[in-house]
Amino acid sequence: MTVALMWEARAADGRGAELLEWARAQALDPAPPRRETFTAPADRVLVITWWDAPYDADLPEIPSPPEELLHRPVHRWRFGSADADGP
């Protein structure tokens, strides 16, 4: 099964570039087969990692950044693939 972990944070005012740099620097062990980082208005950063694992597998996650970088707490979601064939 393919599992996607989503991590989203909104930076404190004027700290979007720092939050993006921090998120990109977070190494996961083991590294996921696929990882993408996105940005959006209001200094939001989204990281999605894809894993070949059962839905409830113990997978490494990006931690919460230092509080001074955040406008609000980090949001996290876990999704399982709905494709019958799966990648």
Annotate each predicted stretch with a short phrase.
Residues 2-10, 46-48:
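Active-site-flanking beta-strand signature of metal-NTP-handling nucleotidyl enzymes
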Residues 3-6, 22-28:
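Structured catalytic/translocation cores of nucleotide/phosphate-coupled proteins
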Residues 8-21:
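Short, surface-exposed ligand-recognition loops at beta-strand->loop->(often short) alpha-helix junctions
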Residues 37-42:
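A short beta-turn/loop motif at secondary-structure boundaries
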Residues 81-86:
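Extracellular cysteine-rich, disulfide-bonded domains and loops characteristic of secreted proteins
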